[in-house]
């Protein structure tokens, strides 16, 4: 059994490439996407349809309902299940998606022992400043408005009595797949902008507004996934704050910002990745599986 990861910015063609390669290499797929895990979020997540998936076994798609918890721990458990299935059935494993934080946890590991995040008993800014005063080396790697990571660092401090640096020193990370080969899809900026624009138009045409109305009615706006790109802008449209043209433009702009963040993260975190355009990457991956 061989395994690898395919990454790239949103709308880069990761899903199509993974499906094509999986069909050629006797592989199953683990989705590396924090939105595809949710049932009933089909259009906003741009998840592959059942027809597109065909006979290829997928993990990480339609795993939980929007009001249910899913985080990096659940993802790592999914990885274990997917790998066990692949080994048992003599399949290869392709991990594909744009949630780089999950992939980083897979190749670098996370520390065990913490409960769920401790709720902040002060403002996000105050919590950041407190932690910065206690552990400058660790906190200067985190943006002050990064709510998830600030809350995680604060939880470490409140639950363990240790600064994050002290905690990780005493609780070293354990990686599940430290030597995972990572392949990254590259696009020229103008081409990626065009792909994002076309996908956004298709999402709206396919029923994004109706999907969002359904999700809000069934789950309210409380779940974290209701703040995802595509959904949050559609809620603004439904509130009468923006018109339909602005809805499209805003989704495109926010998706472009996401793509920029993903690109920066991938460059900074996965230094041993192989990056190329799709045709060349396809050949390199097929070659890897054939060795």
Task: Please place each PLM-identified region on the residue numbering.
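Phosphate/pyrophosphate-binding catalytic cores of soluble transferases and nucleic-acid-acting enzymes
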Residues: 1-291
């Amino acid at each position: 059994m061989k395994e690898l990861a395919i990454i790239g910015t949103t709308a880069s063609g990761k899903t199509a490439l993974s499906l094509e390669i999986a069909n050629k290499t006797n592989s199953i797929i683990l989705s590396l996407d924090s939105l595809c895990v949710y049932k009933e979020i089909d259009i906003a997540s741009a998840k592959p349809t059942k027809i597109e998936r065909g006979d290829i076994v997928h993990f990480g798609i339609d795993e939980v309902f929007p009001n249910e918890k899913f985080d990096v721990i659940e993802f790592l458990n999914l990885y274990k299940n997917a790998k066990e299935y692949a080994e048992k059935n003599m399949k290869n494993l392709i991990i594909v998606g744009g949630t780089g934080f999950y992939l980083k946890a897979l190749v670098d590991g996370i520390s065990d022992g913490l409960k769920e995040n401790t709720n902040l008993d002060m403002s996000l800014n105050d919590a950041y400043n407190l932690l910065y005063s206690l552990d400058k080396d660790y906190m200067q790697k985190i943006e002050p408005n990064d709510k998830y990571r600030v809350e995680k660092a604060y939880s470490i401090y409140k639950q363990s009595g240790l600064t994050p640096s002290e905690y990780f020193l005493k609780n070293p990370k354990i990686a599940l797949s430290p030597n995972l080969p990572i392949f990254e899809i590259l696009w020229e900026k103008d081409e990626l902008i065009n792909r994002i624009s076309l996908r956004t138009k298709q999402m709206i045409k396919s029923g994004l507004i109706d999907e969002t109305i359904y999700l809000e009615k069934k789950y309210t706006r409380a779940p974290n996934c209701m703040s995802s790109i595509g959904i949050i802008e559609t809620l603004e449209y439904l509130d009468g704050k923006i018109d339909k043209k602005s809805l499209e433009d805003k989704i495109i702009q926010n998706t472009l910002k996401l793509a920029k963040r993903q690109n920066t993260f991938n460059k900074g975190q996965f230094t041993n990745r192989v990056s190329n355009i799709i045709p060349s990457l396809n050949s390199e991956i097929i070659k890897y599986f054939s060795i």
